[in-house]
Amino acid sequence: MISVCIATHNGAHYIKEQIESILCQLGTNDEIIISDDGSNDKTIDILLAFNDKRIIIYSFKQPKKSKHSHTYVCKNFENALKHAKGDYIFLADQDDWWMPNKVEKCLEDLKKHTLVVHQAEICNEDLKPKELLMYRDKFVFKNYLSLKVGKYYGCTLAFRRELMKYIFPFPDRLVLHDQWIGCMA
C-alpha cells in the first residue's frame, strides 16, 4: 500500500491537476492523506469533488504561535504522516505535478533502499521547466552531508514505513521537515 502525504493551506490553484497526476499512478487500496491547515479558498471543495475514497482529508489545528512560519508546515506534514497507513510513503507539496512514471520508478528503488531522493524540475505555472534539481546520489545523502548541505525537497522523497519510527515526534522548532526525514534515514 502507498500513502501520499500532502499538507495543504489555500492550495486551490494547483491542487486539481496535482491530485489527477497522483491518482492515476495509485492502486485502489492506496491513499492520499491530506492534512489541511484551515484553507479558506476552494481547496477542500476541489478535493471533495473527486469523490474518491482514496483521498482522505484531516483537519489540522495550528500549534501555538511560532516565530518560524515553516513550523506550521512541518507540523501539518507531521499530522498527515501520522495518519498514513502505507508501506511506502511519498511526500507531495500542494503545487506539485507528478511525472507519469514517478511511483513506479520510486518503488523499484525502494525495494533496495529505505529512502529515495529523485530528480525534479521546478516549473512555472504553465508547467514550463525553469530549473532542474539534480542530486549527486539518487538515494540518500550521508547524514553529516545532509545537515551541512540540505539540498533536497520533500516532493523528491519517498521512503519505506520502517523509517516512521525514527522521525516522530518532529522537534518543536523544526523548520524543514524534509531535511529531518532525510537525516533520520
Where are these regions (language model features)?
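Short, well-formed alpha-helical segments that are part of the catalytic scaffolds
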Residues: G11-C24
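Acidic helix N-cap motif at the loop->helix transition within catalytic regions
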Residues: K16, D41-A49, N101
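Glycine-rich, basic loop-to-helix element that forms the pyrophosphate-binding segment
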Residues: Q62-A84
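Conserved donor NDP-sugar-binding/catalytic core segment of glycosyltransferases
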Residues: W97, N101-K130
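Short aromatic/hydrophobic "clamp" motif used to bind/position activated sugar donors
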Residues: I89
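A conserved acidic beta->alpha catalytic loop
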Residues: D36-D45, Q62
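Cell-envelope/extracellular polymer assembly enzymes that use nucleotide-activated donors
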Residues: M1-S3, S21, E31, W180
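Conserved nucleotide-sugar donor-binding catalytic segment
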Residues: N143-A185
